[in-house]
Amino acid sequence: MRIEYELKYWDYLLFNVLHQLYSATVQITYLGFSVLSFYLSYSYQSACAAAIYGLLTYLVMWAVQIPFNVIYLYFGKNRSLLTRHIVEIQDEAFYDETRFGRSYHYWAGIAKVVSRPGFIAVYLNANAAHIIPARAFSSPAQRQSFLTALEGKLFTSN
């Protein structure tokens, strides 16, 4: 199965925000600071007020992180990423082609495939992924078919 699309800034931003939101490390860190805020404020406030303070700490951390991502990703050097892509599920590998290069990633070397609102991500490792936006597919059925084919290749290679 072959899909052609142009990866845009908003696709890249959505991927990064959701990648962080679903990250256990980020969640544990943010929740840890929230618990610390609760604990430090509990000594001089009611439990309810301390809980609200802890929740606000968590929300403020995201309110800082997301604008940081917007700026950081906008000014990054991403011309070889934010371009037209052709991806294909081949028998032995996941194939990606842009005007800058071609890559083959054998199925055994792919870490995981995830489906999130707005995209499918083919993770090569914990920090590198191919992002396929939902708009690249002609229908939700085609997206599901592509995802099922990817998962099938991963399952049979491991």
List where the protein language model places each region.
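N-terminal membrane-targeting/pre-transmembrane regions
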Residues: 1-37
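Phosphoinositide-dependent membrane-docking surfaces
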Residues: 8, 94, 103-120
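Conserved beta-hairpin
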Residues: 63-104
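Alpha-helical transmembrane spans of integral membrane proteins, capturing the lipid-embedded, hydrophobic core
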Residues: 31-35, 54-62
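A membrane-cytosol interface segment of integral membrane proteins
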Residues: 121-158
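Hydrophobic alpha-helical transmembrane segments
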Residues: 36-58
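Generic beta-strand structural signal
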Residues: 88-89, 115, 124
